[in-house]
Amino acid sequence: MQEYSTLSGLRFATIGCVLLLAGCAGSSGFSWSNLSPFSWFGSSLKISAQGVGEINGLTAMNKDAIEKGLDGKYHLRSGMETKNGQLVTVFQAMDSDQLKVALFGQEDGKVSRIEVLDEDIETVWGTKVGMPFSALYSRAFGACQNTVSESEKSAIVCVSPQSKHVSYLFTGNWNGPEGLIPSDDVLKNWKIERIIWKR
């Protein structure tokens, strides 16, 4: 009788686990990468002067190398695009339907540029997406230049104080003339939209 009760309890627990996993997998906000023990303590990926995670200027622009370099944390999709008049290979690292990291490579077949949009990936200096301009710079002069973000917002790109290989793209509200950098007083509340590493 006790054996029947144990089997019945085990069967109930198994069915419960299957339903729970099926429910999680079906929800759009769920990511299988969250089940990885590495995700329990935050991202192990870091941005440095050398690259992002294990990816650097010597990493081949192929799926296996990039997946390994990003700890298998994302779903990858690839394609080609024209950037500054050159045809480049692009890998997009996705979490569900959100772009988290974009990697670009030129004709030599190596990674040449990485754009990080994932708030969980910090630089080795503690900088991350969402940080305000005022946390890193007191003024734009000498470090920043005007640009336009992918989202067509007003934007500036500022070279990291720690490395010329790392830049921060800041976006924010400004109604001034196109082509000019906003005043430092306006910029102080702009936030990092993406962190860029270049070879």
Annotate each language-model stretch with its function:
Residues V157-K164:
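Short, structured protein-protein interaction patches enriched in aromatics and acidic/basic residues
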